[in-house]
């Protein structure tokens, strides 16, 4: 009997338990160190530029509407925070992609209780680098046109008032894609097939992406939550019957 599906927060909570377990802790340390170095550097840079970015994005209002500045300023602060968050998350996941893919493999072994993946070796990890980086570039190709569109929208007066909510929705969707793609890619599921499967599981995907998005906004906590999100996404793949998404692809391959 298959294990029951969970909610987004439950997947993340169970993922955190998994990465803190003795058998998986070792596979978390290296990506955690990479994320820490990147996080410190980005926070240092953003801290020096934050006010300047907010001022550039804020629309210039006539004097009789100047009182609106007090209402709009928090909105544009949120917008800058979201943009910094996106930058950190995308860079961290590109750099740590091979380690995250490998962590996802090991989590799936623990969850399923069977090991269908090759035994660990540094050669195997190195061999994963081209495939995982190519997949990250595919994600970047999906992300950038949409992010650029939202970025341009942020500079259009009046219309830019909806930029922050749109960034939020897009961010939630991207978090689902970013992390659930690790187990999907380990099983060689094509990019378009993976997106189609996530759309079929839209509400479950948005629930998981939403909680991941929320916890990754919390400084320091986000460093540990990134590997927890990888583990939670792998559990999502197993519990939500991700293998079913591979059936059409396997039929095409056989034919």
Swiss-Prot record:
It comes from the Bacteria. Keywords: Amino-acid biosynthesis, Cell inner membrane, Cell membrane, Cysteine biosynthesis, Membrane, Sulfate transport, Transmembrane, Transmembrane helix, Transport. GO terms for biological process: cysteine biosynthetic process; sulfate assimilation. It is found in: Cell inner membrane. Belongs to the CysZ family. The keyword Cell membrane applies. GO terms for molecular function: high-affinity sulfate:proton symporter activity. High affinity, high specificity proton-dependent sulfate transporter, which mediates sulfate uptake. Provides the sulfur source for the cysteine synthesis pathway. The chain crosses the membrane at residues 26-46, 71-91, 150-170, 211-231. The keyword Ribosomal protein does not apply. Its main location: membrane. The gene is cysZ. This is Sulfate transporter CysZ. HAMAP family: CysZ. GO terms for cellular component: plasma membrane. It is a multi-pass membrane protein.
């Amino acid at each position: 009997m298959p294990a029951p599906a969970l909610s987004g927060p439950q997947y993340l909570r169970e993922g955190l338990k998994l990465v803190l377990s003795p058998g998986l802790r070792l596979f978390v340390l290296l990506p955690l160190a990479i994320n820490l170095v990147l996080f410190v550097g980005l926070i240092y840079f953003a801290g020096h530029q934050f006010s300047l970015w907010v001022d550039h994005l804020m629309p210039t209002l006539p004097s009789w509407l100047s009182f609106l500045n007090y209402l709009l300023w928090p909105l544009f602060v949120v917008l800058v925070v979201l943009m910094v968050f996106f930058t950190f998350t995308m860079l961290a996941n590109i750099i740590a992609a091979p380690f995250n893919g490998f962590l996802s493999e090991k989590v799936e072994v623990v969850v399923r209780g069977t090991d269908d993946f090759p035994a660990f070796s540094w050669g195997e990890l190195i061999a994963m680098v081209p495939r995982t980086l190519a997949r990250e570039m595919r994600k970047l190709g999906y992300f950038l046109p949409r992010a650029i569109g939202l970025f341009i929208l942020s500079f259009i007066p009046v219309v830019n008032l909806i930029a922050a909510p749109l960034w939020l929705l897009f961010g939630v969707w991207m978090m689902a894609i970013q992390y659930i793609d690790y187990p999907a890619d380990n099983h060689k599921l094509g990019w378009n097939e993976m997106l189609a499967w996530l759309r079929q599981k839209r509400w479950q995907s948005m629930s998981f992406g939403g909680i991941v998005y929320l916890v990754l906004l919390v400084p320091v906590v986000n460093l540990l939550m990134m590997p927890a999100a990888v583990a939670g996404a792998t559990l999502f793949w197993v519990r939500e019957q991700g293998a079913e998404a591979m059936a059409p692809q396997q039929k095409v391959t056989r034919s």
